[in-house]
């Protein structure tokens, strides 16, 4: 995505969290039929100017072809803003600061002379490990695509749609080098009507399964059922299937606002809460 698109996604998240209003990506850019931005919602975006200023200070986007050479050169240049090297050791200006580096996504990495696309992906993964371990403040996040064999007819017949480590496309090193691996799976795209007792026929693309495939910090092989709401760029954990009596309710994100209205936030630390996974 381009920087304006990234900002639009983040602003849509902010608007929903603060005002409880969904502002579509297309509407924000007045793209498509019946997607003209109204004056009311334009004023709403202007009220987000302070938030956008924060994005300007904290986010830097790089477009164009990506190779390992470009990746390392760019990150080393950026690191100079946050510290310096001393005899091979990186001294951070603020050791508590974390720099998130997102590559979206790895399948768009370009092959170079003498290297295949897989070689470049492996090299970027290897360099990310080095930067992560030597700087102590850099956290590379690599977005990758599953191998298409994950959707093979044979796997569907055997009810083996869940993601595994074998599904990562082009680069096994990416999985091996990662400390944490999250996988997203859409049962609707596989034309499933039910999935782990959830009514996918009703939820359709609003249901996304997130799997913690790997974690060097604790338990892995964890499944989290999520509601995906693209108009406000939110993933929100939904209840267990035996706790859902109206699936239509979970086709938009307003159910979480209704729930928050019933929470006494001043007593939040005094009672047991069911944790929710929200992106």
Language-model regions: role of each:
Residues 60-62, 141, 182, 210:
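Hydrophobic/aromatic beta-strand patches that form the interior of the parallel beta-sheet core
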Residues 40, 44-62:
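A short helix-to-beta-strand connector/capping loop
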């Amino acid at each position: 995505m381009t920087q304006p698109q990234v900002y639009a996604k983040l602003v849509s998240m902010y608007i929903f969290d603060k005002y409880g209003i969904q502002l579509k990506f297309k509407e924000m850019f007045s793209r498509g039929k019946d997607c003209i931005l109204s004056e009311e919602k334009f004023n709403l975006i202007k009220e987000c100017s302070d938030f956008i200023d924060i994005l300007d200070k904290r986010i830097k986007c790089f477009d164009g072809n990506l190779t390992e050479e470009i990746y390392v050169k760019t990150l080393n240049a950026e690191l100079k803003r946050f510290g310096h090297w001393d005899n091979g050791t990186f001294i951070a200006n603020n050791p508590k600061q974390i720099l998130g580096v997102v590559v979206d996504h790895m399948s768009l990495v370009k092959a170079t002379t003498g290297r295949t696309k897989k070689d470049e992906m492996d090299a970027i993964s290897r360099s990310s490990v080095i930067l992560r371990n030597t700087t102590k403040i850099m956290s590379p996040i690599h977005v990758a695509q599953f191998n298409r064999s994950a959707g093979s007819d044979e796997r569907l017949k055997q009810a083996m749609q869940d993601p595994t480590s074998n599904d990562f496309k082009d680069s096994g090193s990416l999985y091996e080098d990662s400390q944490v691996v999250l996988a997203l799976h859409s049962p609707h795209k596989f034309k499933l009507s039910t999935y782990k007792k959830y009514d996918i026929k009703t939820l359709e693309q609003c249901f996304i399964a997130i799997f913690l495939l790997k974690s060097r910090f604790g338990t892995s092989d964890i499944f989290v059922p999520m509601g995906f709401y693209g108009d406000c760029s939110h993933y929100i954990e939904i209840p267990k299937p035996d706790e859902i009596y109206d699936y239509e309710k979970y086709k938009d994100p307003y159910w979480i606002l209704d729930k928050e209205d019933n929470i006494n936030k001043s007593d939040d630390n005094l009672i047991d809460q069911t944790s929710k996974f929200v992106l």
